[in-house]
Amino acid sequence: MDVHLRLAERRDAEAIRSIYNPEVVESTVTFDLVPRTIEDQVAWLDDHSGGHPAIVATDGADDVVGFGSLSPYRPRAAYSTTVEDSVYVHRDARGAGVGAALLGELVRLGTAHGFHSAIARIVGNHEASIALHSGCGFSTIGTEREIGRKFGRWLDVVLMQRML
């Protein structure tokens, strides 16, 4: 697949939502329990600008096939040099290098914006995301046991980090 990356724009809100919402209602890769409305998605995009960008991956037809973002790791000031990444790939585009392209660009953007480290918080059974992050230079630094509950199951979160 021919993958192109660019900063996300408001016009991408529906495409991003169409990738994200199935994960909300059908999987544990996000701990959100309620699908996003278009207004929620536009607000999310508005919050991801400057040093905490959202990006999209498009195919040759300029259709959005994945998205990623950098978010503040925690609100307290001493955490301001650390970001948390998120990467989502459309189910039909998985295995085509979209996730690696998105994560590589997020690492590049985080470095360019002067952040010191990036954190990934990955549900414990999401082996593809753990492998993706490992392949992009992230190391496992711990596991938070049973900190989320979805679909009647307790969920662990694997913490991974990369120094930028």
What are these regions (language model features)?
Residues L7, L33-D92, L103-E105, L109, ...:
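Acetyl-CoA-dependent GNAT
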Residues Y20, D62, H133, F138, ...:
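Conserved active-site tyrosine of GNAT-family acetyltransferases
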Residues G95-G110, E127, A131-G135:
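Conserved acetyl-CoA-binding loop-helix of GNAT-fold acetyltransferases
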Residues S69-P72, A77, I119-I122, S134, ...:
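Conserved catalytic-core motifs of GNAT/GCN5-like acyltransferases
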Residues H52, L155-L159:
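Short hydrophobic/aromatic beta-strand or adjacent loop that forms the aromatic wall/cage
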Residues G110-I122:
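Conserved GNAT acetyl-CoA-binding A-motif
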Residues S18-P35:
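Helix-loop element at the rim of GNAT/NAT acetyltransferase active sites that forms part
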Residues H4-I16:
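A short beta-loop-alpha structural element at the N-terminal edge
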